[in-house]
Amino acid sequence: MPQYRSRTSTHGRNMAGARALWRATGIKEEDFGKPIIAVANSFTQFVPGHVHLREVGKLVAEEIEACGAIAKEFNTIAVDDGIAMGHGGMLYSLPSRDIIADSVEYMCNAHTADALICISNCDKITPGMLMAALRLNIPTVFVSGGPMEAGKVRLTDGTARKVDLIDSMIAAGNSAVSSEDLERYERSSCPTCGSCSGMFTANSMNCLTEALGLSLPGNGTVLATHTARKKLFLDGAKRIVELTRRFYEQDDVSALPRSIATFAAFENAMVLDIAMGGSTNTVLHLLAAAREAEVNFTMADIDRLSRGVPCLCKVAPSTEKYHVEDVHRAGGVFSILGELNRIGLINDHCLTVHAPNMAEALKKEDIVSPQVTEEALTRCYAAPGGIPTIEPYSQSARWESLDDDRVDGCIRGGEHAYSKDGGLAILFGNIAQDGCIVKTAGVDESVWCFTGPARIFHSQDEACDAILADQIKAGDVVLIRYEGPKGGPGMQEMLYPTSFLKSKGLGKACALITDGRFSGGTSGLSIGHCSPEAAQGGAIGLVEEGDLIEIDIPNRLLQVKLSDAQLAERRQAMLARGNEAFKPVGRQRVVSKALQAYAALTTSAAEGAVRNLEQIHIKRD
């Protein structure tokens, strides 16, 4: 029988000093011997997805203690990718994932916590906490802060529609949008607390924790403002106490994250991601999480899965019609999983934190299942309140009806899929030998095959300036390099270049290729994560202005129209530059010591941009 980890610091004569300190945190004599559960919060006033989490942390901690355990809360950092976007702040976003993972490990191991509940939400926080949970392998439940309500804007010409953050960015670059209308977009796009309302990175990852089995149903789709979210937090607190007792008091290893997040569970998460056209960033994060779990889940597996999964759900930014609140009305993640299971694409034997296995969970949680529970149906009626607020679970609006239309609704059945090809695809070729990724759900099928001249840029700032100055024309392939994990460093998101292409009416007329990455809010022919990156000697660094680039999504191909001999000749010329080989030309960028340390240890996007300590070389005399 495993022993509570916390006994290390709470029992024995030699731990009198530690117990004295525990008492100073509020622990009473009768509490010693209870499990200590770490509440990893990520409250910050910088991020709308996290601005409400101070109250949530208190709620969760109180419920844990009501269930007979000790709750000890701490906070991690949280970077808002939208605020950090378009300037040097974006260099810090992806590196923050490792800082978050490390901080959770440090706190849990330093204080011998027995279990962990993760109150995450936005882009790098859920992945960072997921990496930590799988690294620690102690009982863990994820309860995210929940998605933001979609905004509603009425423009000066009287037109009205739903909007999100990306609409403001596109409008800003469109000179045809008046200053008054731009202000209306700005004031309407982000009306409440929560993670931005489309199927962007934050919501994608919070949905994927459901498919992995590490969070409760509704985690990815119940709105932050709705009272149903409060129940989810309370249920999560109860569940972590149950899992903790199961492992330590019943020797039930099925309560551990690595027993739940197996290879088959990672397949389920990726299949969901492909079917719902999730953010391309999820590929980075799933690869990184799998590595922490010691699961051999690779780009080859993602490529294999992407070729056989249809697109069953389209949400902003891939369509203006639906946002995450609409996915919830249609049954949420478990209804997408249910449709995938009906066509044989889900490993339903996988464990979850809330049901014996995925098969049992699907029976109860899929709203079109004959055995769906009343609780699941009630949860899916949770609707947006339409009132701007940063208060959590502050409204209880209900949809008049659920969307169970699997022919023309938000979620489709296999026979009525949006497309037989899923929403994400891995491409390979002579400038992406280790692969790259495109969100096909957001690409108009008319440009799935595209050839055009390369326009070369060594920073996204340079590319944005060219786009806004009308130097990019229809048919061009904008190629931004030296923005990968090492080359940036930090692998910046390219949301502004893609948004500005749309602003200029070029969203379906140009392609953008990078060894950097894209925001979950990106759509259009945007291909990222080209590996190896330019800074590591990748052939993307050998492309020259005007070279023809061929993109063939159906055949999973990305290449520059040059022979192997021509590329070899260019490589020799590049290497002849010595210390300046495979470095950006003319770019002025201050790189802090923190980012230099990240660059020294990080790996390729094809490996999840995780750290590889083998890259440390110690000089010895």
Curated annotation (Swiss-Prot):
Its EC number is 4.2.1.9. GO terms for biological process: isoleucine biosynthetic process; L-valine biosynthetic process. Its cofactor is [2Fe-2S] cluster; Mg(2+). It comes from the Bacteria. Pfam families: ILV_EDD_C, ILVD_EDD_N. Mg(2+) binds at residues 81, 123-124, 493. One of its GO terms (cellular component) is cytosol. Pathway: Amino-acid biosynthesis; L-isoleucine biosynthesis; L-isoleucine from 2-oxobutanoate: step 3/4; Amino-acid biosynthesis; L-valine biosynthesis; L-valine from pyruvate: step 3/4. Keywords: 2Fe-2S, Amino-acid biosynthesis, Branched-chain amino acid biosynthesis, Iron, Iron-sulfur, Lyase, Magnesium, Metal-binding. GO terms for molecular function: 2 iron, 2 sulfur cluster binding; dihydroxy-acid dehydratase activity; magnesium ion binding. Signal peptide: none annotated. It catalyses: (2R)-2,3-dihydroxy-3-methylbutanoate = 3-methyl-2-oxobutanoate + H2O; (2R,3R)-2,3-dihydroxy-3-methylpentanoate = (S)-3-methyl-2-oxopentanoate + H2O. The active site is at 519 (proton acceptor). Binds 1 [2Fe-2S] cluster per subunit. This cluster acts as a Lewis acid cofactor. PROSITE patterns: ILVD_EDD_1 (PS00886), ILVD_EDD_2 (PS00887). [2Fe-2S] cluster binds at residues 122, 196. The keyword Membrane does not apply. SUPFAM superfamilies: IlvD/EDD N-terminal domain-like (SSF143975), LeuD/IlvD-like (SSF52016). The modification N6-carboxylysine is found at residue 124. Belongs to the IlvD/Edd family. Homodimer. HAMAP family: IlvD. Functions in the biosynthesis of branched-chain amino acids. Catalyzes the dehydration of (2R,3R)-2,3-dihydroxy-3-methylpentanoate (2,3-dihydroxy-3-methylvalerate) into 2-oxo-3-methylpentanoate (2-oxo-3-methylvalerate) and of (2R)-2,3-dihydroxy-3-methylbutanoate (2,3-dihydroxyisovalerate) into 2-oxo-3-methylbutanoate (2-oxoisovalerate), the penultimate precursor to L-isoleucine and L-valine, respectively. This is Dihydroxy-acid dehydratase. It comes from Magnetococcus marinus (strain ATCC BAA-1437 / JCM 17883 / MC-1).
